[in-house]
């Protein structure tokens, strides 16, 4: 293959490289600023109003110590792991099975069901009706109140359905001729061929459930069931609600308000940042396979 060395191509590569570097900096610098701020001297940090490339003063872990002083942090971490693991498994399984059903042209009501599902994405009933439904099902103050309302995503179902629709119909027909049922076709033929898209959907659900706090705030009163994000939210606003985490922590956060704010952001973000590099390779191919109909 002959490499194109024309002036126009060279200019394009230079501009493209500069744009990529700029986009990388836009994504990287905010998190770097937060990390540096979380280990900076609290007094100097309160006086700073510029981007940080290194810590202000001697590096300190006081912000993280103040966050860890909250007795609910460990239990909230365990709760969040439960919500992420169980919720992601249920959501991914439901998305795969529903996507398979809606992709079958032999299923008479697939278009009707798809319209009904899509309507739920476009029109929301609202917070009060949702609360009343959860209450009528006696799910208030239970883990299911956090898991069930956000169990499935119409967007993810659409991606999975489209990915399965692109598979050759002859594969499923030949399997049926050999006596395979829908469960066998889904698990042994369809799933191995759409596992890249499935991996992306799993990551979408995991990130969404890791960051979930609103349903917990709306449906939970038992602090032992609170997810991490809700506890961290309380830490951030503890100056206006001193009873949220206890007087000892509140006093510390009064003196280290900015430092603790940045430390909580890092605590909530690092787990997802650690997982992303291992799943990044699935993103482009998985989403494109499920989003573009061939």
Language-model regions, residue ranges each:
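A hydrophobic, multi-pass inner-membrane permease signature
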Residues: 2-294
């Amino acid at each position: 293959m002959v490499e194109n060395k024309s002036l126009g191509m060279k200019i394009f590569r230079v501009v493209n490289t500069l744009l990529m570097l700029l986009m990388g900096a836009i994504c990287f610098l905010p998190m770097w600023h937060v990390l540096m701020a979380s280990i900076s001297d609290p007094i100097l940090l309160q006086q700073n109003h510029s981007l940080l490339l290194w810590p202000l003063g001697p590096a300190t872990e006081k912000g993280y110590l103040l966050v860890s002083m909250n007795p609910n942090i460990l239990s909230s971490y365990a709760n969040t792991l439960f919500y992420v693991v169980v919720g992601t498994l249920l959501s991914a399984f439901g998305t795969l099975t529903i996507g398979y059903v809606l992709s079958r042209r032999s299923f008479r009501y697939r278009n009707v069901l798809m319209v009904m599902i899509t309507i739920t994405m476009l029109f929301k009933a609202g917070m009060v009706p949702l609360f009343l439904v959860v209450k009528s099902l006696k799910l208030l103050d239970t883990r299911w109140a956090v898991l069930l309302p956000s169990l499935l995503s119409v967007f993810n179902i659409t991606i999975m359905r489209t990915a399965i629709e692109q598979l050759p119909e002859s594969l499923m027909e030949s399997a049926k001729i050999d006596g395979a049922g829908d469960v066998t076709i889904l698990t042994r033929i369809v799933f191995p061929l759409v596992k890249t898209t499935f991996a992306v959907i799993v990551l979408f659900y995991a990130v969404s459930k890791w960051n979930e706090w609103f349903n917990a705030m709306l449906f939970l009163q038992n602090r032992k069931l609170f997810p991490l994000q809700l506890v961290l939210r309380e830490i951030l606003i503890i100056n206006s609600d001193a009873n949220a985490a206890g007087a000892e922590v509140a006093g510390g956060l009064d003196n280290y308000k900015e430092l603790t704010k940045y430390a909580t952001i890092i605590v909530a973000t690092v787990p997802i940042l650690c997982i992303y590099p291992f799943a990044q390779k699935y993103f482009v191919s998985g989403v494109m396979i499920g989003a573009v109909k061939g």
